[in-house]
Every structure is written in C-alpha cells, then in structure tokens.
C-alpha cells in the first residue's frame, strides 16, 4: 500500500476496508513494547449481522476479530492509565488509537493518522447501528404479528362475506360496528368479554401449529351443495374463523406419535445416544460445547471453568521446579516458542545423561530470576548470562506430589526423602552436584511451571498449564 493510500471496496467483493495498524497484545503483555505487532488488516462483511476484521503478516493469516452488535468501537482508550502507557511507548496522539471491545477481549489499534482512525470507527459504528435498528424493527413486527388476529375467507363464500371479513379487520369499521352493537344490545359487552377470555384460553392451551386437514374434501362438499341448489349462508368473521379452524387439526397428536416412535427406537439403540430434543439448535449447541445433559447447573459451570483453565483441577496441584543447565545445553538442546502469550517448550533433544527434563508445552516462568515477556528477552537474558559468567546456586524448596506420580523418574537428580509422603522437602540437583563437584560459574536457572491432571482412564500425567 504505497503512500498510505486507503482502499475501499463494496459489499459485493466482501472487502470493505484495508490498512496497516499496530495491534495490541493480550492484556498480560500490554506493557511489553515488543509484543505490539504491525499487521495488515482487512475489514470484510461476514454475513448480514457481523464484520470480520482479519489481520495478516507477510500474506499469512494470523487471526481475526469478530465485530457484531454486541461489540463497541471508539476513538482513543477509555482507561486513562492505558492511554498514558500507549502514548509513552509509541509517542502517539489519543485520536490516533482505535479501541475495539468484543465479548472475549479488548483490542487497541494504532494508525498514526487521525482521519483514518475516525473513518474506520465511523464506518463500523454506523454498521452496528443499522444492525440494532433492523433487529428492533424485526422484534416489533413479531410482537405486532402475535397480537394481530388474521381471518381467512374462502373465495367460494362470495363477495359479501369477504367484504365483511375485511371490514371487521379494519380498525375504524370495527370500532363503529362495536359501538352500534353496544347501543343496540345491552348484553353484548358481557358476551364479548366471555368470547375474548375463551379465545385467550384456547390460545394458551393450543400452542402448537395447525396442519391442513382434508381441505379439498371440504371444498368438494361445498361445490356439490351449491350445484344441488342449496344456498350458502353468508358468515360473519367469527363464523369464518370457526370454519377455518375445522379445516385444521392440532400437531399434538403428531408430536406424541413421533415421540413414542422415537422412544421405542432409542430403546433399541446404544445407551450412550443423546436424547432427541424439540429445540434442535439448542441441542446442537449443548452437544458441541461438550456439556452433559445429566449435569446439574453447578456441575456444568464447574466443567466450563475447568475447560477454560486447560483442564486444571485446582492450584494446589501446580508445581514450580528449578532446572539447572549449562549454557551450551540450553543453546544446543532446548527450543522455545510463544503460544497464547506464554513462552513454552517446543522441543527438548537432550542427551541420555540429562534425561527427559522438559516436556512439550512446559511453561517458562523465569531465567535467572528474571521474568521474560518474549523470546527476544529470553535470548537477551541467556546472552548476558554467558557474557558475564554469572554463577547460580542450586535451589531447593517444598514440592507437593500427588499420589501415584513419579516425577523423580522424569527428571534426573530429583530426590525425595520418602517417595510415599506428600509435601516432603525436595531438592533439584544436577549430576555434578551429586558427585560433590564444584558448580560451574555459568549454569543457568530456568523456572518452569508443571501441573498434574487425571486423564479419562484415570492415569496420572504431567502437562503444562
């Protein structure tokens, strides 16, 4: 995009806007300047009720931000503290920052162009307002449709009955007729109220849709009677409505028939089959989210919380260990990567003398008591440690072992005074420490976070949190 020119496309191409912005990292890395990345953003229409703001790096898709009627877009940052931090890091004006708040996260985009930021915010805000207005109109139409009583007149009833049915649906004519009937018949009001109460009760009791039943046969009977010379009475609105109701039958019979058949079929199938529900969309959502129908609301909430935490039962099973390695071992055998805002172990190819110290996904907490925020800082800490030849002592602390776990077999040099006791004093030592040799001056201390969970078959295993 040369010269900072902005390209705008129509909805037919699905792409509405595109430009470069500096995107904010997750909240835990907000203060890290290196975590803010420049990305190419493309704003496209994802259906009739949402936008998709995708961002790319070197033509590779890195993620997307879903913007719907529940999202909010504004110029600047509402939090004064965050706004000051952004100004300090990037030397930008508040009008050059765009805030996008979604259901799951809050994003901040820096563009260094006030007009461009204002244009993007105005475009997305107007789209959200159109969605809300359309949704309100739809809800009003549905509410009016539920309150309105529709009458159906057969073309075989003649023009007089049709005109009466249409006239009764007109508000002005209906009010005039009602006023005249009240004056001529004193008992009209009581009868009318009874009819309304009975109709309301019928609607509450019969809340299923009605299906057509033998309409053609009914029409044939009417035609036959007209051919034989019998006169067709002109019906009022109530009589027309009653006649139409006789052409339909309730769905309750079909519903219970299908339910009985489904119960018989389900009894023949495996017991693990989920029961059929009347609301298919809700059933698919519950099944897709992995929620069991037999769980109580409290159990469902607890299960959802465990899923969000990565299947970690509680914090008491989280262990912090200190691992001591020489700089050559770290450089040659250990590979790290960034995932979900954390620094994790992607590969460990240590020799047999070191053993399987790390597992894929272990979370790096600190390097020589320094907490890195990115891979660049890890490399910086390791480089400085090698150049200064810092010496590190071997640390020992309380480590709680779950019953049946054998962590000491996974990491060489890990000992406990009693393998069956819980929360015993433990020490993480390397081979040269057990041989009573002097510790080298360039050993590195890497702190990792482990946790224990139970798999579905009940076997204990160690994974990263």
Curated annotation (Swiss-Prot):
Native organism taxonomy: Eukaryota, Metazoa, Chordata, Craniata, Vertebrata
Identification of the protein by name: Pleckstrin homology domain-containing family S member 1
Biased composition (Basic and acidic residues): 258-271
Region (Disordered): 159-179, 258-283
Top-level taxon in the UniProt lineage: Eukaryota
PANTHER family xref list: PLECKSTRIN HOMOLOGY DOMAIN-CONTAINING FAMILY S MEMBER 1 (PTHR47014:SF1)
Domain PH: 14-129
Gene: PLEKHS1
Ranges of biased composition (kind: Polar residues): 159-173
Organism: Homo sapiens (Human)
InterPro entries attached to this UniProt entry: PH-like_dom_sf, PH_domain, PLEKHS1
Gene3D superfamilies attached to this UniProt entry: Pleckstrin-homology domain (PH domain)/Phosphotyrosine-binding domain (PTB) (2.30.29.30)
One Pfam match: PH
């Amino acid at each position: 995009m040369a010269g900072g020119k902005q390209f705008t496309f129509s909805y037919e191409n699905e792409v509405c806007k595109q430009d470069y912005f500096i995107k904010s990292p997750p909240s835990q890395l907000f203060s890290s300047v290196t975590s803010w990345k420049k990305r190419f953003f493309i704003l496209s229409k994802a259906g009739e009720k949402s936008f998709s703001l995708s961002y790319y790096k070197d033509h590779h898709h890195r993620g997307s931000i879903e913007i719907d009627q529940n999202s909010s877009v504004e110029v600047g940052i509402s939090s004064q503290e965050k706004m000051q931090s952004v100004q300090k890091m990037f030397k930008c004006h508040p009008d050059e920052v765009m805030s996008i708040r979604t259901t799951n996260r809050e994003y901040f985009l820096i563009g260094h162009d006030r007009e461009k930021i204002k244009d993007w915010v105005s475009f997305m805000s107007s789209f959200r307002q159109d969605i809300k207005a359309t949704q309100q109109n739809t809800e009003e139409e549905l509410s009016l449709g539920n309150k309105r009583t529709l009458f159906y007149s057969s073309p075989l009833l003649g023009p007089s009955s049709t005109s009466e049915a249409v006239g009764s649906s007109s508000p002005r004519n209906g009010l005039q007729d009602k006023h005249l009937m009240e004056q001529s018949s004193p008992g009209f009001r009581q009868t009318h109220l009874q009819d309304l109460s009975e109709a309301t009760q019928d609607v509450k009791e019969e809340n299923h849709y009605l299906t057509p039943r033998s309409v053609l046969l009914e029409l044939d009977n009417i035609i036959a009677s007209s051919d034989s010379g019998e006169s067709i009475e002109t019906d009022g609105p109530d009589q027309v409505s009653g006649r139409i109701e006789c052409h339909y039958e309730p769905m309750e019979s079909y519903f219970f028939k299908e339910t009985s058949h489904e119960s018989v079929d389900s009894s023949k199938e495996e017991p693990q089959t989920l029961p059929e529900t009347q609301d298919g969309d809700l059933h698919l959502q519950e099944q897709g989210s992995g929620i069991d129908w037999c769980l109580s609301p409290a159990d469902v909430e607890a299960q959802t919380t465990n899923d969000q935490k990565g299947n970690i039962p509680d914090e008491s099973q989280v262990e912090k260990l200190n691992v001591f390695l020489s700089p050559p071992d770290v450089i040659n055998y250990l590979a790290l990567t960034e995932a979900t805002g954390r620094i994790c172990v992607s590969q460990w190819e240590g020799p047999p003398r070191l053993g399987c110290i790390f597992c894929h996904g272990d979370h790096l907490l600190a390097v020589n008591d320094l907490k890195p925020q990115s891979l660049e800082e890890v490399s910086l800490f390791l480089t400085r440690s090698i150049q200064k030849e810092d010496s590190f002592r071997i640390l020992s602390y309380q480590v709680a072992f779950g019953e049946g776990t054998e962590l000491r077999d996974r990491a060489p040099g890990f000992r406990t005074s009693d393998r069956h006791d819980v929360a015993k004093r433990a020490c993480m030592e390397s081979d040269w420490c057990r041989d009573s040799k002097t510790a080298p001056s360039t050993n590195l201390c890497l702190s990792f976070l482990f946790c224990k969970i139970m798999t579905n078959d009940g076997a204990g295993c160690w994974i990263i949190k």
